[in-house]
Amino acid sequence: LEEGYRSWGGGLGISAALSGIELDAAYEYINWYLSGWVGGYLMRQGYYSAVPETSKEFMSADEWGFWYEGKAAEGDILSPTGNKLAGAGEVRDGGSFFDRMGSVVCWNSVMDENQYMVRKWNEFIAA
């Protein structure tokens, strides 16, 4: 099976053991996380938010066009820390979000090497 594009995913979950104020705080955190600021920060590093539409208001039109729509940058594209990542006229490798995600052919939830890496990590931290 030919792989069209590789992608990573992440998510947030709530422990079934939470209740009361702790459960309320967990939901408040997740709502904040998905409200846009975090997504805008992540997208400036080349990652995507689970709710990209909320990220748009925390990005300039040029940033949104470059990172999400696959458009050529109109000016410098900066990382969240201010480092220049692309200049005017440059386009993101792989195209728009829809082009990139539309090319995913096979989605694996865990890499083949996962168990090996976990064992090696545990050996490292136990040393």
Regions found by a protein language model. Give the residues of each.
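Conserved C-terminal helix/tail region of periplasmic/extracytoplasmic solute-binding proteins
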Residues: 81-127
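Short acidic (Asp/Glu) and glycine-rich catalytic loops that position anionic groups and cofactors
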Residues: 6-9, 97-99
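Acidic, low-complexity intrinsically disordered regions
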Residues: 4, 28, 60-63, 103, ...
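Short beta-strand->loop
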Residues: 1-6, 17
